[in-house]
Amino acid sequence: MTGKTSKSATKNSRTLVTHEFPALFDSNSRVLLLGSIPSPKSREQGFYYGHPQNRFWKVLAQVLGEKLPETIPQKKAMLKKHHIALWDVLESCTIVGASDTSIEDVVPNKISELVQATHVERIFCTGATAHKLYQKYCAEDVGIDAEKLPSTSPANCAVSIEKLVEAYRQIL
């Protein structure tokens, strides 16, 4: 996708966001992790879970027994090594900042096409909003119900890193 976020948007205004980077997968992918839509920091970096306080990469590295990946190529390699695909439920939406609870005007990604091109048998959503959106817009078409994982977002700081690691172990 080549859509852009409105440059005139302020922190509290509703912005049309179009997913700007592709799903990460290959034909050997067996597990699919789905977020909702990339955060402003992720869109800046051009890759998933780019906010420095988001605990996604730290949690995944611990679950997979890997060194914490620091670069985008290292992150991609870690996921591919463990047959994990990564994408977001939404192709586009309107949103206020990074607040998943403000998401409206949704256009879902074609997740069924990714699943058909892979060996994905299990789908996990990285947060309640991603799970709700997947179940509402995608589950029937895909034919796989998703399991809900706790969000690794800094907004979900009440959940400790230890609890996140424990919850994410089910992807193995």
Tell where the protein language model's regions lie, with residue ranges.
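Alpha-helix capping/helix-boundary segments
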Residues: 129-131
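Short, surface-exposed acidic-centric catalytic microdomains
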Residues: 41-102
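Short loop/turn segments at strand-loop or loop-helix junctions that form parts
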Residues: 36, 89-91, 151
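Generic beta-strand or strand-like secondary-structure segments
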Residues: 59, 85, 110-114, 133
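Short, hydrophobic/glycine-enriched beta-strand segments
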Residues: 30-36
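C-terminal capping/extension of enzyme domains
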Residues: 1-30, 52, 97-112, 135-172
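Proline-aspartate-enriched helix->loop->beta-strand connector
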Residues: 111-124
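Hydrophobic/aromatic beta-strand patches that form the interior of the parallel beta-sheet core
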Residues: 32, 85-87, 124, 147
